[in-house]
Amino acid sequence: MKKIVLAIIVIGYLTNLQGQTLYFPPLTGNEWQKLTPEELGWCTDGIEPLYTFLEGKNTKAFLVLKDGKIVLEKYFGTFVQDSIWYWASAGKTLTGMLVGIAQKEGLLDIYEKSSKYLGEGWTSLSKDQEDLITIRHQLTMTSGLDDGTGEADCTLPSCLIYKAEAGTRWAYHNAPYTLLDKVIETASGKNYNTYFAQSIKNKIGMNGIWLKPDYNNVYYSTARSMARYGLLLLNKGVWNGNPVLNDSVYFKNMTNSSQNINQSYGYLTWLNGKDSYMLPQSQIVFGGSTIKDAPDDLFAALGKNGQIINVVPSKNLIVIRMGNPPNQSGLFVPNVFNNDIWKLLNDVMCNSTSSAEVNENQIRVLNNPVRDRLSFTGSTLEGYFEASVYDVSGKLILNANHNNDIYVGNLASGMYLLTIRTQTDLKTITWVKE
């Protein structure tokens, strides 16, 4: 019994010790401690290729934090440390945490029906159908509302129509998420910017503001403010010993699979290292991790045009990217671009391998994103194989039997699927047409 008690004490001590190793910058001013890549034993000859890649992909700001301290901080063009940029859907995690704070304060319960806060008739569903939708369904993208109407951002009842029973279908749908703002405003009795500022922003020294250019509510801030929020996520909702989200159960649920349809999605948060994943504007379930060259325990806030917060608890690492679209596809979730960053970042950290390390037997697309020719390689292609290209909705675009260099210059920009069937295997790869 004494040994068990001693073990519990030691584990608790080590857990607290790990938390104490994180550095937190002051709430005001520009002071922020730094570490050099040399101090960490990183391979500095990989930094310039990383920066060259980022600049070529329209990046404006890029930061890497280790143990809360800045290791890499690079701004491109006229963008500087104090420049403001939009988060796009990376801001969804801000709302996800804010809902958890409101619940901890007793203002709402995520298992309550959404109509309690949005009013009856917030959709065009029948009352029975609408009453099945809860706040949790809005957090997990399982509202069952139709995301394929062509008005996925529209929050008017006429735009919110029935597709499936709540909880039975995962679809990346902005409108139900955006309406969480009104849920929070109704529950708190405060303006969304006001409640956000007092609950998160001021407590961690962020700057920024929520603005509504249309139906969407978009957060704008500096890259360092984005890094501050990444640090809050890394420390599980606690800032320098002060709880911001004082609910460890909610945080755990936020950063773990929230349903069994898309294993790689928590509460408005993307997850890595799962057996499968889904992407916006598609009902296809892909096998493997969302970001294959990144650590399995990574979770992320990802936004359109490559707005990225990567958090890696096992390495006490935070990676931030702000900027314009890295290519012409304008994907809602930049998982391919994010993976390309990790390939180069692994070289910088002298860790060129990952759980998805490529070997000669694996089939892989060359030069992804693709311009005119879709080329792929792998030793399993030495025999006969069938190659097919699909769009993300699953529609067949073309077949090319026993041809690993396919002309795709006439395809529209966006994400596609390459399916390769050999005599022994069936492989599906996502790729992006610039």
Model-derived segments and their meaning:
Residues 68, 85-111, 138, 180-184, ...:
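Active-site SXXK
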Residues 359-434:
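C-terminal outer-membrane/trafficking sorting elements
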Residues 105-143, 190-222:
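Active-site helix/loop module of the DD-peptidase/beta-lactamase fold
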Residues 15-80, 85, 103-108, 140, ...:
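N-terminal leader/targeting segments and the immediately adjacent pre-domain N-terminus
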Residues 1-21, 355-356, 368:
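Bacterial Sec-dependent N-terminal signal peptides
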Residues 330-361:
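Short, gly/Ser/Thr-rich active-site loops of penicillin-recognizing serine hydrolases
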Residues 205-313, 326-331:
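Penicillin-binding protein/beta-lactamase superfamily catalytic region
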Residues 140-216:
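A small/polar active-site loop signature that marks catalytic segments
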